[in-house]
Amino acid sequence: MTATVPPSTDTPAHDATETRHRKLAIIGSGPAGLTAAIYASRANLEPMVFAGNTPLGQLMITSDVENYPGFPGGIQGPELMQLFRDQAVRFGSTLVERDVTRVDLSQRPFRLWVGDDEYLADAVIVATGASALWLGLPSEEHFRGRGVSACATCDGFFFRDREIAVVGGGDTALEEALFLTRFASKITMLVRRDAFRGSKIMQDRAFAHPKIDVRWNTEVTEVRGEMTVNELALRDTASGEESTLAVQGLFIAIGYKPNTDLFAGQLDLDPRGYCLVESGTRTKIDGVFVAGDVHDHLYRQAVTAAGDGCKAAIDAERWLESVGEIEASTATNW
């Protein structure tokens, strides 16, 4: 059931230069957040977008994007996100390239803090995304976008007729490996334990596929190469024995973590930490909406995140109109 948040009866005691009040705040600047900003700006809401210290989302570490509509020749991830940003700014969005460190969604206007600076917003769109879980190796970081990936759907095409490895033992890893069989000549699954954790049907499919080989009790200790990946250093978790594996690509598939720590105890989260919605993009709190991978653990694509951002902006604008924060004549017919 949606909670009706009462308007605040007190005004924060801050200097006007430190307190900023907008009709709409958008937390996050990936495809969802910036699409929301584009639509909200066109509705004259002049949204403030909190882009974070590492702005523009996961596509900033994606080399070639070939599945986003409108770019038949493909486009570099950073270039695509810069176009998103430019379009949002063109229509009147303000970007704050710092992280929101605290929020109070208990009353309206909602309160957000960036360090010691406080911001107020009549509505909020949460578009903080989800981060792939990585192995944490310095060499892994070095080769991201140059043979190391966490998205088979995004990057699998670039490994046609190559030998690659997939790290992980759950459904995510099994799904990624099976998807990659469309492109790669051979896939070696590297599993830390002596068994998969994924569903039986997914295991059966992997075991039956001629392109998939499995190495149990195996972890990656180093990613090696020159310009791109060409070898993995491995360790047997049972015996400690070290070995190497020649591959041209490494896919990390050990799961995702939604970036929702900021909202714990205020928004409803599922057991994995993803935001729950009650209808469309609405949360249990009136005036708070979500978009993108912060609640979508199924698709996780730039185009679906952008669609979510569009919906969240329209939902937020209509809600602001319904509570009298904007005049009906201000509303856009899109």
Where are these regions (language model features)?
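Extended, non-globular alpha-helical segments
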Residues: 1-15, 45, 126
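A Rossmann-like FAD-binding core segment of flavoenzymes
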Residues: 2-10, 88-114, 118-119, 181-279, ...
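Beta1-alpha1 glycine-rich phosphate/pyrophosphate-binding loop at the start
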Residues: 16-91, 162-163, 174-200, 270, ...
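Conserved phosphate-binding and hydrolysis motifs of nucleotide-dependent enzymes
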Residues: 28-33, 129, 168-170, 292
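Glycine/small-residue-rich loop that forms an oxyanion/phosphate-binding "nest" at active or ligand-binding sites
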Residues: 95-160
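FAD-site-proximal beta/loop scaffold in flavoenzymes
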Residues: 5-14, 21, 131, 136, ...
